[in-house]
């Protein structure tokens, strides 16, 4: 896990996303309201370059993330998933892929909007959307019901807070570096005003980060004990320690160094401390990259049956019911499908009827609809299913409860060649 390339790609992508969005927040919300900012057009140009660098890196790392994820899903090389359509299946048939397309459009739009300094609302709105959309493809976006909605809102606020503070730090360092070298009248007063505004934005962001971080941990951990007994919990614990060190540095910046502006020593120390915060913040993002590769302890489900080594398997979870779907063998050709329907406490769900619908990859053919037969052990089975092609299929389980209620559960499933 330590050398997992996908985790590092995720970290780099989040860093680039925070850089682009955070720089927009800093330029519009912190620098923009300061009247004297109009006297420094060169600074605005440098901020725009910083945004474009972040957007370019986020597009590059986003494409790498998509291809690497497709390779992991299909168990193929990077070259094969690019040449044989695996990456396209992930892009066209999954929520993650749709979000990638939407964020690509937002990146292009944001890159153009920063050229229009008179418009403040649109760049901030585009930057915020670009920043929070990954939450819809995260654990929060996959959690069903009201609890999932709360988790999703919390995740979005967590990302916005990180962007307003950590993402804006490179722009703040750029401002301090420019101020340190400037000889132009008005720079000192301008730097003091901007630093004070940013310090208050940082205070609000830290408060929101702590509140949403606690809520997210409550949703993702099975209990406090998981912080030292599980890999997932230990990574969250390390993240908390790093965040605490960043808050300590930010406290020194606000209460010790900011009042001493505009002395050169204060500017130099603020710049040095902000660079330290950026370094620690990137370490936090690396941990986030690895956390996304692990199953949250609150989401770990006990295996109800032994999954055959050649089978394709997916677990579908909704507030009304859960389904474990096993396709054996999990490759193109003829297979048998076993469906176990249960409640959230893993007791058997008393269903009147169960139907199985299989949708082929990228709408490349007609759907297959089957009536499942109940087995003596309580599972439901469909025999002799002909899977015409490999790729990312969509499985839908339609459960008719004893009360007559219809419950639809759907999820992607990978069929090998």
What are these regions (language model features)?
Residues 355-371:
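Short amphipathic beta-strand segments in non-cytosolic proteins
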Residues 342-343, 367:
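A generic local structural motif
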